[in-house]
Amino acid sequence: MKPVIALVGRPNVGKSTLFNRLTRSRDALVADLPGLTRDRHYGEGRVGERPYLVVDTGGFEPVAKDGILHEMARQTRQAVEEADVVVFIVDGRNGLAPQDKSIADYLRKTGRPIFLVVNKAEGMKYTAVATDFYELGLGDPRAISAAHGDGVTDMINEALEVAYAGQPEEADDNDPSRGIKIAIVGRPNVGKSTLVNALIGEDRVIAFDMPGTTRDSIYVDFERNGKKYTLIDTAGLRRRGKVFEAIEKFSVVKTLQSISDANVVILLLDAQQDISDQDAHIAGFVVEQGRALVIGVNKWDGLDDHARDRAKADLTRKLKFLDFAKSHYISAAKKTGIGALMRSVDDAYAAAMAKLPTPKLTRALIEAVEFQQPRRRGPVRPKLRYAHQGGQNPPLIVIHGNALDAVTETYKRYLENRFRETFSLTGTPLRIEFRSSNNPYADKG
């Protein structure tokens, strides 16, 4: 699984600035999705071919006893426990603060690799910036400027060397012999453990720990209707005898790792509860990761017709950026609707792995343009000439032509819908990339 880097520090030391710098390339993928809440504190970064998850823990007050500061401290401690590397950020402008010492005392006891980072160091000599912070006993401070990017690349490369050293080798994500890897995600008490047990049945369970990290993940292999699947543990499912029960602890880190590791994600919602920001955050990360998705609305049997209509309207309004995914209204406890849910899992995986021939893609593109041309931007109208597939899981369609920077987001969504309809790409995010032609004769004739 992707390693996790937790950003820790007292308020206003620049954690969010560093987070935004580390994750900006990923944020761009979901920036224009309507209905998506943007105030996330977790995301993906990438250096070369090495992806990683990064968690901004919020301002850390380790001695807070109650209220919102206590809750923030609890969440921070959990993130630190589950991180591969902790980046402890201090403020080079304001110098060493008593809170820094308290946080350092706590971090030393965790046993986690700690990178002490002095932020806001632009324009200052290293000795002037670093001297005070040696007192924390966390080794040599690394001076950076999150706002300007100075020192950030070197720091994150060092952190990733440590983080990846503890990661086990992973098998090919798309190896068909392993079966479809499914992550069932959702906030606490939506019925994840009930759905797991409904899917696997008590007599077909093979559970084993994958060693190699301090957070061993449980993978459960099972067959259903002759097809192989692997369930990935998400947020505290643990085997108790022959069934799985949910430990009452929601882990953002485990959820993000499971989404990243999966072929298909089942986002489980509680029909009897309004959709929350947390649901939207999880859904946004699924889209950002490009994972195939099926929505399960659980506890449907407990609603009357009026409540069902209200729940459907809530889903449409708050998660409209998931309109590519099928929704199923189920009861995990009564095992109703699960067959259709799993058929959509199969369909979503098939769509994510679909091979799209260049001639058919180009024909679909030409037909879409003939039906509705892109708008002009000033005197220029984009010319879309041909398309080919640039990747799978999720499908990437690369469109070639001229003046493609003038293509609007509205027209891009129009093309996406046309491709989805033509190739039955339900259940998977779809990426479209425009590449302007370098052919000097492209506009001739």
Swiss-Prot record:
Residues involved in GTP 2 binding: 186-193, 233-237, 298-301
Alphabetical list of Gene3D superfamilies matching this protein: 3.30.300.20, P-loop containing nucleotide triphosphate hydrolases (3.40.50.300)
Sorted UniProt keywords: GTP-binding, Nucleotide-binding, Repeat, Ribosome biogenesis
Pfam families, alphabetized: KH_dom-like, MMR_HSR1
An example Gene Ontology molecular-function term: GTP binding
Chain ranges of the KH-like domain: 354-438
Record-listed GTP 1 binding positions: 9-16, 56-60, 119-122
Database matches in PROSITE patterns: G_ENGA
GO biological process, one term: ribosome biogenesis
InterPro entries according to UniProt: AAA+_ATPase, G_ENGA, GTP-bd, GTPase_Der, KH_dom-like, KH_dom-like_a/b, P-loop_NTPase, Small_GTP-bd
Top-rank lineage group of the source organism: Bacteria
Domain EngA-type G: 3-167, 180-353
The protein's assembly and partners: Associates with the 50S ribosomal subunit.
Described function: GTPase that plays an essential role in the late steps of ribosome biogenesis.
Family: Belongs to the TRAFAC class TrmE-Era-EngA-EngB-Septin-like GTPase superfamily. EngA (Der) GTPase family.
Protein name: GTPase Der
Gene coding for it: der
